[in-house]
Amino acid sequence: GIFSSRKCKTPSKTFKGICTRDSNCDTSCRYEGYPAGDCKGIRRRCMCSKPC
């Protein structure tokens, strides 16, 4: 991982639809000001990560 500390995850506000590619989600999260993002869970939601 990028961070050695714990990561807090927040659903992306700008990402629409089913998250199939981590790179697309990561781009949306960076646009929102987060350092990273990836697809998570059964429902494939775009989750943005930041150090807690």
Swiss-Prot record:
Distributed in the epidermal cell layer of leaves and in the subepidermal layer region of stems. Not in roots. It is found in: Secreted, Cell wall. Keywords: Antibiotic, Antimicrobial, Cell wall, Disulfide bond, Fungicide, Plant defense, Secreted. The keyword Secreted applies. It comes from Spinacia oleracea. One of its GO terms (biological process) is killing of cells of another organism. GO terms for cellular component: extracellular region. Antimicrobial peptide. Active against Fusarium spp., Gram-positive and Gram-negative bacterial pathogens. Belongs to the DEFL family. Group IV subfamily. The keyword Disulfide bond applies. Disulfide bonds join C8-C52, C19-C39, C25-C46, C29-C48. This is Defensin D2.
